[in-house]
Amino acid sequence: MQSVLKKNIAIIGGGWAGMAAAVVATQAGHHATVFEASHALGGRARVVSGSHASTLPDGTPLTLDNGQHILIGAYSETLKLMQTVGVNLENALLRMPLTLQFPDKTGLRLPDWPAPWVVGLDAAWGILTAKSWTWTDKLALFRAASGWQRGGFSCSQHLSVMQLCERSKPKITPRVMAELIEPLCLSALNTPMADASAQVFLRVLQDAMFSPNTEVHIQIDEKTSRNTTFGSANLLIPTRDLSNLFPHPAAAWLVKHGGNVLLGERVESIAFSNAGWQVNATAVKQTFDTVILAGSPSNMAIAGIHIAYAAINNIAKELEHLLRREVQDWQNSVNALRYEPIATVYAYSKGAKLSQPMLALRSDSGSEAQNPAQFVFDRGQLGGEHGLLAFVVSASQGDRFALQEKVIVQGRSQLNLPDLQPIQTIIEKRATFACTPGLQRPANQIAPGLLVCGDYVAGPYPATLEGAVRSALQAVKLL
C-alpha cells in the first residue's frame, strides 16, 4: 500500500465545507489547521448568537439558526461524515417521508416507509395517492418521469426546468407544476424553475427518488450499536441547531485527532515562497504546504486571485503563462456566478402545532408577491419552543420588513393562526448561487497548492450541504 506524504494544510473558513475538508484531510493522514475569522463555526448554516439572538414575547430566550436547512437520505457523504465525528443521526435528525403537502392535506406525500425494497416504489405510490391530483395530472407526471429515467436523468445543459417540463409528452400539468415541480425546484436549487438548470434538477430528482437507500451505523452507547437504513427520499430535518449538527462535533473530532481550529483568526494575507504558503492571520503566522480556501465565493474569489497571481511570480517562467491562463479561467467562472437570497421569518403563535413538522404553502414569486413563503417548519416538533414557526422564502425579494409583513399575513391566513406575530427575520443575501442552465462553476484548484471548496464549486449538486461536503472531498483528493 502506498504511503501518504503527510502535508501541513491551512483551511481558510470554518463552514460546513471547511470543517469537512479538515476532517477528511486528517483521515487521509494530513495535518489540518482551520482559520475562522468569526467566533462561530458553520458559515451559512450555523446558530445565531450574540446581539442577533432573540426571545419569545414572554422573554424566553431562543436558539435560532441563520436559515432552515434540511437533508435527505440520499445525502450519503454528509451523513457518513456526521457519523465519523460522533453525531447520532437518529437523535440529531427527524426522519419523515418526502412531503410537499399543504395545510389542507393536498399535494404530494410519499408513504412512511423507512427504506423501500424497490427503488422508486415509494415515489410511485406517493404520486398515485396524491390528493387533489386528477388521473391526467398523475399520468402526465408518470410518463415524464419514465422518460427522464430512460434518458439516464440527463438532458441538454442549456435547458431550464420549465422548458424540460413543457417539452415532456404529454406536458406536465399546471397543477403538478405548481404543487411539485416549482416548490421542489425552489427548495433544492433556490432558483425559480424558469431560470433553473434542468440537468441539476434531474440529478437531484434521481438521487432523491430513484437512488439506493443509505445504510447508516448508529452508536447507542459504548457497547451497543446497530445499523439502520434511510430511504433516499426520506427528509431528515435537524432537531438541534446547525452548528451542533456538524461543525462543532467536527471541531472536537479534529482537535482530538491532532488538528487545530482557530476562531477569531482573520487571515490578512497569504504569500507563496520556496518554503511554502505563508499564512498571516490576526495572531498567527505559519507556513503550510497547501491552502484550501473554504469561505464564500465572493470573499474567496478576491483573496484567491490575489494570492494566485502573487504565487505565479515565484514559479518557473516556463509555467507562468499557463498558470496565468488557468487563474484567469477560474476568475471568469467566479465572476459569472449570480447569487440568490433566502429569507427565514421566525414567528410565534401560542399553542400552535402544525399537522406535521414541515408544510408547503401556497406561494407566488417576484417583487410583487403577496404570499412569498414556500414552506413552514414547526420548530416545536423539532426540539425547539412550542408555537415557534420558521417560514422559508427561497429566492426572496424586497425589503426585509415588507417581506416579513407579507409572510405573517400569509401564515395567519393559510395556517389559521390569527395571533401569529413576528419574532425575527434573517436574510442571507448570498445564500446560494443561482443554479442556471449551462453554468460553468469554478474548479477545485486555482493554482498548484491553492485549492478551493464550497457548495459553489463544480459538481453535480446545487448549493446544498451535500454539495459543500462533496466539494471538500474532491479538494482533499487533489492534495
Question: What residues fall within each predicted segment?
Answer:
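Conserved flavin/dinucleotide-binding core of flavoenzymes
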Residues: P111, Q370-L479
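Conserved Rossmann-like nucleotide-cofactor binding loop
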Residues: A17, A40, S298
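N-terminal Rossmann-like FAD-binding beta1-loop-alpha1 element of flavoenzymes
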Residues: K7-V34
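Mobile amphipathic helical/loop "lid" adjacent to a hydrophobic cofactor/ligand pocket
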Residues: T78-S211
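Glycine-rich FAD pyrophosphate-binding loop
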Residues: T26-H52
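Conserved FAD-binding subdomain of flavin-dependent enzymes
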Residues: V47, S54-L93
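Helical element adjacent to the flavin cofactor pocket in flavoenzyme catalytic cores
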Residues: D207-W277
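Mid-domain catalytic core of redox enzymes
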Residues: A28, E265-A402, Q410-Q414
